[in-house]
Amino acid sequence: MLSGGTSTTSSNQQSVFAKFSNVEFYHVGQAYRLGRYPIHFHMNGDMPTSYVKECAIHESFNRATNMHATNYVTIEANVIYNIMGGAYFLEDGIEIGNVFKNNLAVFVKTSSSLLNEDITPGN
């Protein structure tokens, strides 16, 4: 799922949001393709009402959750298993206010075909 576009209006109200709860994502993500992740928040800015909660992401060929220039999203109580590349990934390191709480990631594998960060996803 890709979430993109402008996320706030001039009145400071969020116009784009994504809410995933109790969803199973299986055999997702396109291997060896940057930007093709199961859940990808892409340059949305502030998204304080958005979340990924109590979901299962497994057998992913390209990461699990990816935040790119997106702020204030809650990632909570998710289980991620058998993932290639970074499981919970903040792409630029400028993302702020995102909450990662009570998540589990098991069997996260390296992927030399993505970014250097995906070679050692536990670092």
Residue ranges and their predicted role:
Residues 15, 20-30, 52, 56-58, ...:
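Beta-rich extracellular carbohydrate-active architectures
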Residues 25-50, 86, 90-123:
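Acidic/polar low-complexity surface segments
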Residues 10, 62-65, 90:
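A general structural-boundary detector
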Residues 1-13, 41:
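Extracellular beta-strand-rich solenoid/capping regions of secreted or surface-exposed proteins
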Residues 38-44, 48-54, 59, 67, ...:
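Extracellular beta-sheet-rich ligand-binding/adhesion modules
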